[in-house]
Amino acid sequence: RICYSHKASLPRATKTCVENSCYKMFIRTSPDYISDRGCGCPTAMWPYQTACCKGDRCNK
């Protein structure tokens, strides 16, 4: 799986993962502000929320 791994406003970067999913993490009240991206599907703590997906570069 190829997932985006860049933080919020940094230039796009990808990484090859062994996990079969990608995620993006954002603040629940500001879903347009992505605070983190990467491989897998981690559990988020309030006020963050995780959106997980299963496809190459799906966590745009």
Swiss-Prot record:
Segments of this protein annotated with the region Important for binding to L-type calcium channels: 41-48
Record-given protein name: Toxin C10S2C2
A GO molecular-function annotation: calcium channel regulator activity
Entry function: This specific blocker of the L-type calcium channel (Cav1/CACNA1) is a smooth muscle relaxant and an inhibitor of cardiac contractions.
SS bonds (residue pairs): C3-C22, C17-C39, C41-C52, C53-C58
Keyword Ligase applies: no
DNA-binding is among the record's keywords: no
A GO CC term assigned to this protein in UniProt: extracellular region
Superkingdom field: Eukaryota
CDD domains the UniProt entry points to: TFP_snake_toxin
Tissue specificity statement from the Swiss-Prot or TrEMBL entry: Expressed by the venom gland.
Record keywords, A-Z: Calcium channel impairing toxin, Cardiotoxin, Disulfide bond, Ion channel impairing toxin, Secreted, Toxin, Voltage-gated calcium channel impairing toxin
UniProt family annotation: Belongs to the three-finger toxin family. Short-chain subfamily. L-type calcium blocker sub-subfamily.
Localization annotation: Secreted
